[in-house]
Swiss-Prot record:
Residues 1-265 are annotated as: Amidoligase domain. CTP binds at residues 13, 146-148, 186-191, 222. GO terms for cellular component: cytosol. One of its GO terms (molecular function) is glutaminase activity. One of its GO terms (biological process) is pyrimidine nucleobase biosynthetic process. Belongs to the CTP synthase family. The gene is pyrG. Pathway: Pyrimidine metabolism; CTP biosynthesis via de novo pathway; CTP from UDP: step 2/2. Catalyzes the ATP-dependent amination of UTP to CTP with either L-glutamine or ammonia as the source of nitrogen. Regulates intracellular CTP levels through interactions with the four ribonucleotide triphosphates. UTP binds at residues 13, 186-191, 222. This is CTP synthase.
């Protein structure tokens, strides 16, 4: 029988429901159970693909091309299980599907209502395709009391009524704030949050309490009494120094044991957490450190680069060093000399992005790395800016630019719906070979033998995830390669450039895809492993 755990949040947002869900899944995996993770997002957007990264954080892209919430990245990194479009749904997607069916006449003239039509659609999503799993963990985005979340809470309430007794658990993540003047943790916000949850028909079975210090026995007893849960079900979720300590912290607090007790399942031995202990040891006790500059466009919200920062951490784990990050807004380099900001650093990473803002700053960062022989890693937009820099500085194409920024005489970078014949832009229809305007999901690529990137992968055939509208123009390949910028990887048909590298440079690589989306703490991505290794070599020179 499949068992369902619904993870809700209260008191404040951004408590870490995604990490809590991922950590619980890791603990259940460590006990040998088959686990699936799913996310319900109450916002009205169909998906986060068009949402501002400075508001919502990064868009996590799955192998099958879904643009999803960043929490799915946590799910993949902690469990090693690939997510798909079937693991994330929004209010916008639910309503779009229902309205499409209504316009088609599928409801045979019925009045379409939130109950039962919207709630039934949510239930169908949650319950679909779970027969092969022991546990399905479902995170509900937002906070209890949000108006847009009500249909989702009603749907999971109904699931609890309709499923066999003992097959559903409601876990509520909440906050116990410490008030210095009173010298104590306050339970009242949690009591009110649970009261709100109970008012819509859901009695939490387990309270997972975020706090920065131990919960006194009296406070734990009070929470159990007034929130109507067992005292043993009040679980301490203490703040930790790294997210990779969370599974072990939850294990110590007894979360996995309480979950099994709720389902009346007898634990068989102890969870196998050796690999988590090894990772934590490497994170907390590195043998050295390097400093990497991230020259980005959305540095005001670090969640905009969540997978990227974690992938850099994984690269550090692989090389047993701590990776320190220097966040630099790309626009700064359009006004100021990059040298004072970048001198003494051990690597420069220019990540993806959209739009003209900060583009020239990223180009200047690429030039600085090339001229000073500093390791450079350009991802998506970062690769495109590196190619434009090479075209201008090495090939003498002074007007080289991207059509993303307007008309240009030298379209070194163009839309996927455009193709170049010489310097002429040929418009491509959406149904032509190059597809639509956004290249999403996993695509295969072929790497040239003997290149630095092929050596790092240990293979010439790879598959990586993409999210971009623009591509480097292959018409410029010959003149750029003559100046030392090698097109080291292409699509299998040879039409689209996937990777470039500067020959003669210690480590200068650009990739059109997003390798950070496939990096795991237990399987660091080879490019991040190689980039940090190059940064270590650079640290010995400065």
């Amino acid at each position: 029988m499949t068992r369902y755990v619904f993870i809700t949040g209260g008191v404040v947002s951004s408590l870490g429901k995604g990490l809590a869900s991922a950590a619980l899944a890791a603990l259940l995996q460590a006990r040998g159970y088959r686990v699936r993770l799913r996310k319900l997002d109450p916002y009205l957007n169909v998906d986060p693909g068009t949402m501002s990264p400075t508001q919502h954080g990064e868009v996590f892209v799955t192998d099958d091309g879904a643009e999803t919430d960043l929490d799915l990245g946590h799910y993949e990194r902690f469990t090693g299980l690939p997510a798909s479009r079937a693991d994330n749904v929004t209010t916008g997607r639910i309503y779009l599907d229902i309205i499409t069916k209504e316009r088609r006449g599928d409801y045979l003239g019925a009045t379409i209502q939130v109950i039962p039509h919207v709630t039934n659609a949510i239930k169908a999503f949650v319950l679909d395709g779970n027969d092969d799993y022991d546990f399905v963990l479902v995170e509900i985005g937002g906070t209890v009391g949000d108006i847009e979340g009500l249909p989702f809470f009603e749907a999971i309430r109904q699931i609890g009524q309709e499923r066999p007794r003992g097959s559903v658990c409601y876990l509520h993540l909440t906050l116990l704030p410490y008030i210095p003047s009173a010298g104590e943790l306050k339970t009242k916000p949690t009591q009110h949050s649970v009261k709100e949850l109970r008012s819509i028909g859901i009695q939490p079975d387990i309270l997972l309490c975020r706090c920065d210090r131990p919960i006194p026995v009296d406070e734990r007893r009070k929470l159990g009494l007034f929130c109507n849960v067992r005292e043993s079900a009040v679980i301490e979720a203490r703040d930790v120094d790294t997210i990779y300590a969370v599974p072990l912290s939850y294990r110590e607090a007894g979360l996995d044991r309480e979950i099994l007790a709720h389902f009346q399942m007898k634990p068989e031995g102890e969870p196998k957490l050796e690999r988590w202990q090894n990772i934590l040891e490497r994170v907390r006790n590195p043998e050295g450190e390097v400093t990497i500059a991230i020259v980005g466009k959305y540095t005001g919200l670090k969640d905009a680069y969540k997978s990227l920062t974690e992938a850099l951490t994984h690269g550090g784990i692989a090389n047993n060093v701590r990776v320190n990050l220097e966040w630099i807004e790309a626009e700064v380099f359009e006004r100021e000399d990059p040298a004072p900001f970048l001198e003494g650093l051990h690597g420069i990473l220019v990540p993806g992005g959209f739009g003209q803002r900060g583009a020239e700053g990223k180009i200047r960062a690429a030039r600085y790395a090339r001229e000073r022989n500093i390791p450079y890693f350009g991802i998506c937009f970062g690769m495109q800016m590196a190619v434009i820099e090479a075209a201008r500085s090495l090939a003498g194409i002074t007007d080289a630019n991207s059509t993303e920024f307007g008309e240009t005489r030298e379209p070194v970078v163009g839309l996927l719906t455009e193709w170049m014949r010489g310097n002429e832009l040929e418009r491509r229809a959406a149904e032509s070979d190059l597809g639509g305007t956004m290249r999403l999901g996993a695509y295969k690529a072929t790497l040239a033998e003997g290149t630095k990137i092929a050596q790092m992968y240990g293979d010439t055939e790879i598959s990586e995830r993409h999210r971009h509208r623009y591509e480097v123009n292959m018409a410029y390949r010959e003149c750029l390669e003559a100046k030392g910028l090698r097109f080291s990887g292409t699509s299998p048909d040879g039409l689209l450039p996937e990777t470039v590298e500067h020959e003669g440079h210690p480590w200068f690589i650009g990739v059109q895809f997003h390798p950070e989306l496939k990096s795991r703490p237990f399987e660091p991505h080879p490019l991040f492993k190689g980039f940090i290794a190059a940064a270590i070599e650079q640290s010995r020179l400065v």
